[in-house]
Amino acid sequence: MSRAQALPDPAAVGYPSFKLILVGDGGTGKTTFVKRHITGEFEKRYEPTIGVEVRPLDFHTSRGKVRFCCWDTAGQEKFGGLRDGYYIHGHCAIIMFDVTSRLTYKNVPTWHKDICRVCDNIPIVLCGNKVDMKNRQVKAKMVTFHRKKNLQYYEISAKSNYNFEKPFLYLARKLTGDMNLRFVEELALLPADVTIDLIAQQKIETEIAAAAAMPLPDEDEDGLMD
């Protein structure tokens, strides 16, 4: 087992540590997302044999500290698929797409298939990033893949810190088996680089909730038709 795969023994360090797989097309904001967590930026390390950066992100919860060892592709997805070593021993995953690029959403099923091929039945969160941008192309009604595969979905904006904590809170609850778990300390995040129109975003969130009550599209459409 490589140094990156050897997570701390919970009994020895006193807190649980989980390998978090972060995937998605290049340019969707994965690295920007994990770098918002200040402590993770200071402690990152590079694993050249697999081509990833591993960032330990700590969260203080009502059950004590929880650490996600976040595996970032470091751009390797631009050269084709990721090696199985990236996925092996993964406890959970985040699939990210860019709401201003339909292609990145269209490729979500491929990323999901890669995860499921190596990891058996782990909790997965789908994140639509860059909701602070005005030129949104993936409309609320188009986002249906998570419903087909029973994934959790969040709209996020890495640059504005919008909903940053939600994917981690959901995964921490699933992995600890405590759906009442909560964060007890404010997250140490970098200051927001941009602002987000919260009124407009709330309208979109309402549309997403309404779309969840609608019948799913045919398998080959996957919500990408207008």
From Swiss-Prot:
Region span, Switch-II: 75-91
Database matches in InterPro entries: P-loop_NTPase, Ran_GTPase, Small_GTP-bd, Small_GTPase
Keywords: GTP-binding, Nucleotide-binding, Nucleus, Protein transport, Transport
GO molecular function terms listed in the Swiss-Prot or TrEMBL record: GTP binding; GTPase activity
Lineage: superkingdom: Eukaryota
Domain Small GTPase Ran-type: 14-178
Alphabetized CDD domains for the sequence: Ran
UniProt entry tagged with the keyword Protein transport: yes
Record-stated family: Belongs to the small GTPase superfamily. Ran family.
Self-association and partners: Found in a nuclear export complex with RanGTP, exportin and pre-miRNA.
Disulfide bonds, paired cysteine numbers: none
Provenance organism: Oryza sativa subsp. indica
Pfam families linked to this entry: Ras (PF00071)
Database matches in SMART domains: RAB, RAN, RAS, RHO
Primary location group: nucleus
Start and end residues of each stretch annotated as Switch-I: 44-52
Compartmental location: Nucleus
Gene: RAN3
Residue numbers binding GTP: 25-32, 75, 129-132, 157-159
Protein name (database record): GTP-binding nuclear protein Ran-3
GO annotation, cellular component aspect: cytoplasm; nucleus
Biological function: GTP-binding protein involved in nucleocytoplasmic transport. Required for the import of protein into the nucleus and also for RNA export. Involved in chromatin condensation and control of cell cycle.
Biological process, per Gene Ontology: protein import into nucleus; ribosomal subunit export from nucleus
